[in-house]
């Protein structure tokens, strides 16, 4: 994670985190991937998130789907650190791992996603980050509504999702196949595209362009993989519930969605009256 020290200027404080961050599951397979292209893409994603954090004020931050806690650890040791940062994940195993690795970091807390239903969390957060999560959610609308409830008045939602349309999807599928052959990450299980599906994905606009596979876990819950995800469709859903502020692209902003690998959507919670009118 040396990139973080260089780009965000945390200096000596960052060195304390190096071992804790490096040992994280997602850090190992993403920012420290054996594939230089994959590592570059994800390092750029984290750097973009930290840069955007400078535009998002607030004392209490939630990272929904925090994974191994890498982003929160970098955020809490950067120039835009909130007073309290909460990471939420699905399983007790992930939460326990994060708590153990970052037990010496003040202001960082890790909880189960189900814990967010408690009254203490309603309206409690000035900013919510949801990175590389919503593309996997079969029905994002209820989750977006939950974010609105968790945010304080005027709070900010920062979303990042993969770009799986246009030229990027073709390049990504090639990279995933090569990574799969090399035994890197989860890429051996990448869902394939037919020729027609790939053409529709390359030419996709603002409506859903192909059917998305629904995968069922052993516990009966369902999720999507990346196939067929359209960030423009999600942007419309976000805009129905929040005021869209701006968008960005990573790993390099000037690439735009035509060539970038992730799209960022920054939105602000609407006033109660405006939200009620929109729902009606």
Task: Go through each PLM region and give its residues.
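Flexible, glycine-/basic-rich loop-and-beta segments that form/coincide
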Residues: 273-280
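S-adenosyl-L-methionine-dependent methyltransferase catalytic module, highlighting the catalytic core
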Residues: 15-44, 93, 114-117, 138-152, ...
